[in-house]
UniProtKB/Swiss-Prot annotation:
GO terms for biological process: symbiont-mediated suppression of host innate immune response; viral process. It comes from the Viruses. Induction: Expressed in the early phase of the viral replicative cycle. Coiled coil: none annotated. Belongs to the orthopoxvirus OPG027 family. It comes from Monkeypox virus. The gene is OPG027. This is Interferon antagonist OPG027. InterPro entries: Poxvirus_C7/F8A. The lineage of its organism: Viruses, Varidnaviria, Bamfordvirae, Nucleocytoviricota, Pokkesviricetes. Pfam families: Pox_C7_F8A (PF03287). Inhibits antiviral activity induced by type I interferons. Does not block signal transduction of IFN, but is important to counteract the host antiviral state induced by a pre-treatment with IFN.
Amino acid sequence: MGIQHEFDIIINGDIALRNLQLHRGDNYGCKLKIISNDYKKLKLRFIIRPDWSEIDEVKGLTVFANNYAVKVNKVDYTFYYVIYEAVIHLYNKKTEILIYSDDENELFKHYYPYISLNMISKKYKVKEENYSSPYIEHPLIPYRDYESMD
């Protein structure tokens, strides 16, 4: 049947991007377009719930915002989940963010989802699902302790 992790992103404890993992495979990631009219500081929490059936180790995450590398910290690791966090400062009206475990160009074109977040109008949209089934939860009601950003 193949390996399938679960991958979610929590943004500022208010927005959840759910099911960003591929339908099958050991890779996870997405492309975000964030629109903002002023400076914003976003705290992102990346939650990976691994499928241990065919792997021994979870791949790390790489994050780029407008082609600049973003520091990602592993903050928690259990058998059930791995949590990374990053802080992104939005200075431009439009910010492109790439989040991935494998940066193969083909994955961004045809597999990883593409999501648009308009912070001005509070309109959030999945632009392209590709090889995943993402959805956006806003406002976020954390149903697991590790989803809370306190």
